[in-house]
Amino acid sequence: AYEDMAMIRREDELMAEADAFIRQWHGTGLTTVAVGPGSTEDISDRLMAKTIAMARSRGLQLATHVAGWAEIVSRSVKHYGMRDLEHVHHIGLTGPASILIHAVWLSPHEQQLVAETDSKIAHCPVANAHLGYGVAPVPELRTLGVDVGLGTDGAASYTYDLFEVMKTAAMLQKVQHLNAEVLTAEDTLEMATVDGARVLGLEERIGCLAPGMRADIILVDFRQPHLILNHQLASKLVYSARGHDVASTIVDGRVLMRDRQVLTMDEDRVLDDAAAACRDLVERAGIETRDLLGATWPERGPRWRKAAGPDWYEGGTNG
């Protein structure tokens, strides 16, 4: 009983912290806050329901990892008698203001459920590939009318370069379907811009250049060997460009970077602070984690899997 009460208190503390964060930051300047429970395996259904209620009552979006890896689906079937997407739908998380991250292992029925509830998808192809999650059914979802945007997931993906994300998104689908036209450069560019804005619920403010929209613009330097033939611009941007090809950025009409010089911060200081924070994080993680991070490449994979335990992979299906 004591442990349960302690858990309830901790949940209340978390909700209070989230409420304070929303009050402080949502709608200030260009900042928009969403509620982001990690996944159905990170928190209890009870806390998930509380976060859903908070988001709905405040008119905020929800974002959570759903059916990203095969084993979360198999464990969901084992524990709840339903697949992961079916589970979050049962809890009440799906809907027009809900962003489902990854959504790799979706059955045809679940894909239809996403469409029927007008839920949104944050597709993270680089993270999915790097972590061995699988290939999300992006063309199938788009055919059903689902809004699919592009994401980076997090540091585990090893990139925040959206050009690389675009290229990976297109390439994975071509290989998966053995069809070079299943997801075109134009499709992918839409996912990175107008579709991404719809996923975020910001389509009336960002996502394209039009009268009344915020002036969010990047200037790409095409005078480079890999970009010099600048016909078929969509293909060039998706398949050849990289983040370092961006020369200048403008956000809401304000120039933040000009000729690759960031105007709003001291880059060297930020990099030094980040390096120090990384060292501190690894140090505090303990000797076992430091050991694993320092392992050489032939043994790192097996050691990580051994450390994760026998349930590291339980299999699953997206069929």
Give the residues covered by each predicted segment.
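Short, acidic/turn-prone active-site loops that include or flank metal/cofactor-
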Residues: G68, P125-A129, G154-A156
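Glycine-enriched alpha-helix->loop->beta-strand junction motifs that scaffold or abut catalytic
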Residues: I52-Q61, L93-P96, L113-A122, T143-G149
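Long hydrophobic segments that form regular secondary structure
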Residues: L106, E110-S119, C124-H130
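His/Asp/Glu-enriched, well-ordered alpha-helical/loop segment
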Residues: H90-A97, P139-L227, Y239-R242
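Metal-coordinating catalytic core of metallo-dependent amide/deamination hydrolases
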Residues: A1-W105, H109
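Conserved, mostly hydrophobic/aromatic
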Residues: V35, H65, V88, L100, ...
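Active-site microenvironment of metallo-dependent hydrolases
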Residues: T193-G319
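Histidine/acidic-residue-rich catalytic or RNA/ligand-binding cores of hydrolases
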Residues: A70-M82, E110-A115, G132-L141, Y158-K174, ...
